[in-house]
Each structure stands twice: as C-alpha cells, then as structure tokens.
Amino acid sequence: MWLGEYTWLNVFGIFLQATFIQNILLSNFLGMCSYLACSARVSTANGLGMSVALVLTVTGSINWVVHTFITGPKALTWISPSLANVNLNFLELIIFIVVIAAFTQILELLLEKVSRNLYLSLGIFLPLIAVNCAILGGVLFGITRNYPFIPMMIFSLGAGCGWWLAIVLFATIKEKLAYSDIPKNLQGMGISFITTGLIAMAFMSLTGIDISKPSAAAPTSDILETPNASSITTTNLKPVKKVRIAQQRAAKEKAINIKRGKTQ
C-alpha cells in the first residue's frame, strides 16, 4: 500500500517525470493565470512557487488517504465488509477542494505572521491557490494513476517543484526581457507565450527518460522450469525443413515427368 510494486528507482523516476518530462504547467498548461500574473519579479515568483509546491505535496498526500479510505471503490471495507458496495465517489471532488482550501487558509495565516512582505506581494493570488487548477489537477493525476502512498507523495512533490521551477525560470527571463528591444506587436502576452513555448521545448528534450514504471521480474522458479529457447526452435524447425525438402523434390520430379511426356 505504501510503496506497492515500485522500487526507489521508480520513485525517483516519478519525481523526474513530474518535474521535467510531464511538467504540470508546461505540458498540461495548468495554473497559467498565476504563472503569468505573478512572474514580474523573481522573489514573488519564488514565494508563490514554493507555496504551490507545499500545498500540492501536502494536499496530494491527504487526498490520497481520503480516496483510499473514504471515497474510492470499496474504500469503506476497513470499517465493515458490509459497506463494500457503498460508493462515495460523487463526493470526491468536493472533499478534495475542501482539503485544498483548508490547507491554503492555514498557509495564508502562517505567511501573514512569518513573512509579511511575501504575503503582501502575492496579494489576491495567495488565497486563489485554493482554486488553482494546478493543485487540483496534480491531485487528480496522481489518483487516476493509482499510485501507492509514497509514489503519490513524490509525484505531488515533483509536480509542485515543476511548477515552481517553471515560474522562477520565466520570471528570470522576464526580468531580462524588460531591458530588451522587443517588437511592439510582441510586447506583453506575445513574448510571454513565446518564452513559455521555448522553455517547454527545452523540457521536452528529456522525454526519452522513463524509469518511473515498475518492472515485474519473473520468479526464478519459472525461469528454471522453462525449457531452453534454442532447443525449442531447433526441434520445431527440423520437421519443417524436412517437409519443405520433400515438397521441393516432389515439384522437381513432377516438372521432369512433364518434360518427358512432352518429348515423347
């Protein structure tokens, strides 16, 4: 339940895949509003990215518990086997959003006490993390892939770190673009989308790396009991060769008899 068939190498692959290869922002375009609005300064983008990564990691883990023990198929059997047919799947989205909103409110109160400047710089976008589609999308992606608990937590962390990395990279480039000579028709959203597309293309270069899927190895007893592949092929090929040779001989004899009949 906690790790399942996944090895720690697969878990590391899940983190890499969620952060770079299937980046939740650059591949699925989730959370674009706050990505474009809060990327004017690197410090603001860094704070928002850190908040999104924290919220996604914690709420992804909590919502996995909710899905496994409350709303999933046969989730209530731990209470009583008679509740196996009870399906609370229709409440799943509502509960997920409530969990995300509650943790976002806790994070907002903590930032207001700990980092007042970051709290003021994020403004309205901090409470909007509760309805950020990147948070809910990351949770739903992990749930639909049926990850065990630890892979789900690492996937949520990787998705949050991927969003964090994307907005910090974009904010860094955006600060440089402020002093660049950009054509008038491309200023604003135009150059922002072009820059985002180039960053996404750079992340796509890692597409071939896939170590996130568990490899089910065959038991040693099955390997010892299976006959040698070479012996199987040789024994099966011998009758086939004999049949082909006999057919070729029969065809040659038939052709010779036909020629003899014509000459006579």
Swiss-Prot record:
The lineage of its organism: Bacteria, Pseudomonadati, Chlamydiota, Chlamydiia, Chlamydiales. It is an enzyme of class 7 (translocase). Its main location: membrane. It is a multi-pass membrane protein. The gene is nqrE. InterPro entries: NqrDE/RnfAE (IPR003667), NqrDE/RnfAE_oxidrdctase (IPR050133), NqrE (IPR010967). It comes from Chlamydia caviae (strain ATCC VR-813 / DSM 19441 / 03DC25 / GPIC) (Chlamydophila caviae). It is found in: Cell inner membrane. It comes from the Bacteria. This is Na(+)-translocating NADH-quinone reductase subunit E. Keywords: Cell inner membrane, Cell membrane, Ion transport, Membrane, NAD, Sodium, Sodium transport, Translocase, Transmembrane, Transmembrane helix, Transport, Ubiquinone. Its EC number is 7.2.1.1.
